Amino acid sequence: MSPAAAPAAAATAATVAPATATTVAAPSAFDLVADRARAGSYGPDPAGLRIALAFTTAQAVRHAGRAQGYRNEVLSLRLDAAVGSCAVEPGELPAGALDDCVGARVDELLDHPLAAVRVAALDAYLGHCRPHTSARGARTLTLPAGSSLEKSRARAAAVVRLLPLAEVRRVLVVGVVNSLLEQLRSSGAEYLPCDLKGGVTEWGEPVHADALARLDDCDAILASGMTLGNGTLDPLLAHARTTGKPLVLFAQTGSAVLPRLLGDGVSAVSAEPYPFFWLDGGPTDLHLYGGGAR
């Protein structure tokens, strides 16, 4: 299923501000980090760097013993040794997207009309300038070799440990990943599963299509990095900033971008740059930031 929060409903009535007041919308999470990148806060000028390689990865999976499967498609851009990625709905990318990226300057791609290109470009840039190292706060965990299901469960255990479960009653899960729900169940945690596509979980629980409508029913939020790619991260961030609720992100999309939001609404990140666990039966790495008991 596509991990995503549903867009907020439009207001039914406008509030007119006084003539002397100016209302300025807060920048989106993407714009906040991208503007810092353009200003040189993270390293070299993006205008001086070009993407050498663009590719997509598509997969379909249904693990043994599971009643449900899913499909994924990911756009990835390579900048020197770094690969930046953004998941998309299968078939969503237009035919010319890869050609747009190859040889293009990073600063140009940060303004590309496709959100997936913008996110993948920023992710590649930050993966190049801010790799996941202990000096930058990352705790690298190597997932052991195994089947896709074994590695999925190992990743889920690491991600769930980033939540302060002893302090929360119910977790809003934005992006249905069965191994994460399975880990929460085994931890005794209550959860509210949410995904734009709705449906039911592996255990027959209803999946809520509108995550924003359930924000007041949770004590913590566990969300996929795909929310950065489809633009639905911002209301989750706003809620976490306002309420102080833990917001933990598990990210293949934007894995180098989302750690830049730690302390600004985000309490922990599991960052998983390409190649992802499902591509390789051997050991692969997660980079963990923040998290645990507060």
Predicted regions and their residues:
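A short acidic, amphipathic alpha-helical/loop segment
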Residues: Q183-L184, T232-H239, R260-L261
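A short helix->loop->beta-strand "cap" motif at the edges of active sites that frequently abuts
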Residues: G188-A189, T242-P246
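NAD(P)-binding Rossmann-fold cofactor-contacting core
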Residues: G188-T201
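Short acidic low-complexity segments
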Residues: E205-D217
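C-terminal functional extensions of proteins
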Residues: K245-R294
